[in-house]
């Protein structure tokens, strides 16, 4: 068998822990946060962005557009935020 032409890459970039901790302490100094809460917040942001990209891609395909436009992202954001509220 011939080797695959696509090479999978491992993501080596780490979460911006110092930035997240500093921002959280500036915005919400009264919160007592655990050790790994910054990693959980970073993961939550990444999952949100992934859902936003998938939903906006779906919106673009439904409108028969090859390019994801601002309107697609805004509509997807409304849907995702509504779903996350419960």
Curated annotation (Swiss-Prot):
Which top-rank group of organisms is this from? Answer: Eukaryota
- A Gene Ontology biological process term: chromosome segregation
Q: What is its main location?
A: nucleus
User: Record's Gene3D superfamilies?
Assistant: Histone, subunit A (1.10.20.10)
Keywords, A to Z, come to: Cell cycle, Cell division, Centromere, Chromosome, DNA-binding, Kinetochore, Mitosis, Nucleus, Tumor suppressor
Database matches in SUPFAM superfamilies: Histone-fold
Q: So what family is this one in?
A: Belongs to the CENP-W/WIP1 family.
Tell me, in a sentence or two, what this protein's role is. Component of the CENPA-NAC (nucleosome-associated) complex, a complex that plays a central role in assembly of kinetochore proteins, mitotic progression and chromosome segregation. The CENPA-NAC complex recruits the CENPA-CAD (nucleosome distal) complex and may be involved in incorporation of newly synthesized CENPA into centromeres. Part of a nucleosome-associated complex that binds specifically to histone H3-containing nucleosomes at the centromere, as opposed to nucleosomes containing CENPA.
Name of this chain's protein: Centromere protein W
Q: Which organism is it from?
A: Mus musculus
The gene coding this protein: Cenpw
